[in-house]
């Protein structure tokens, strides 16, 4: 007798592709410039993107890592704006903040508590 696996949730392949591209971007940044900051940021953000893509595929109600990921990405690019005054980083950071505000209006206080907990280091695995 076969067991029923339950409802199947499709994998978020776009998130996994983005995670792979972010990691490759970090590697190519290291190869071109020789900066250690580029691969570390690439691997960090690709890890967060992979986590964000795999969570809803296991449980469709878990979408809370996406705002934390976008917030950290916006904070990273905001730091680049302050040090380099790069226009691309400014536009990308503003776009990330708009996405966070849109998700904030959809999910309300749930997102704000998760972001606050992640900033304080209170998130548990």
UniProtKB/Swiss-Prot annotation:
Subcellular location(s): the record lists:
Membrane
Gene Ontology terms describing biological process = regulation of heme biosynthetic process
CC per GO annotation:
mitochondrial membrane
- Give the record's keywords alphabetically: Membrane, Transmembrane, Transmembrane helix
Pfam families reported in the protein's UniProt record: Tmemb_14
Q: Which residues cross the membrane?
A: 9-29, 81-101
For membrane topology, the record states:
Multi-pass membrane protein
Highest taxon of source: Eukaryota
Heme keyword on record: no
Which segment of the chain is annotated as a signal peptide?
A: none
What does the sequence similarity comment in the record state about its family?
A: Belongs to the TMEM14 family.
Q: What is this protein called?
A: Transmembrane protein 14EP
**Organism this protein belongs to:** Homo sapiens
